[in-house]
Amino acid sequence: SMIHKAMTELRRVYIDYTPAPMCVCSAMSQGYVGYDIQNSLRAELLDRGISKPVSTILTQVTVDPYDEAFYEPTKVIGRYMSKEDAEIEVKKGNYVKEDPGKGFRRVVAAPKPIDIVEIEAIRTLAAADQVVIACGGGGIPVIEQKHALKGASAVIEKDAIAGKLASDLSCDELIILTTVPYVYKNFGKEDQAALETLTVAEAKDLIAAGQFEEGTMLPKIEAAISYLEKVPAGKVLITSMDHVKDAIKGKAGTVITA
């Protein structure tokens, strides 16, 4: 199964735009990006003589309405706004954050994922040896209200849901693609060192030492730990798209094991 981030178009500045709830934006992103990935993968597989179905699953993920993230939103999203527009958003009860020299942007909660609503559909397709694109952009965050699912004004960390999906499917391996070929110790410093292998215990020690930045490598390491604690026989590979072919052959990337 594959997971992708939300489309960058949702983050650009639009002078004339149609407002839509966050949950609808997430659904639009899944369809938009999933459509492109699905057709590109299908064409590539056929070019290689492989006849394998590729499907995009519109995926909802339940969250806890009392998750502390709703009380301290941290995820910056959406268009840049003027101070006047930002004040209007605040009056609506929304959170905003100023980006000096650029303007203001919405800030929403990033609650922890609880359950993947469409997990059985994903599992069935994967078991049938089909390529599945699911949980795009982290999934559509929803809150359970009796038998109904109500969209939440939030986003789910894509790395967190990747770890959740991998453990729910008992995958043998979780591959997380990022912008760097390895996980690094002392990243960006003179003594920066690439880490070829890590254990869960070592990863936890590095987190405690403040080695991984929030919003960049930290959520990837946390997702790896979450997955491996549920699937101890599995492994996690973290690398960049440019190095993924070598990484699969064991020539690049950071491998994390239990």
Regions found by a protein language model. Give the residues of each.
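C-terminal catalytic "cap/lid" subdomain
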Residues: 1-258
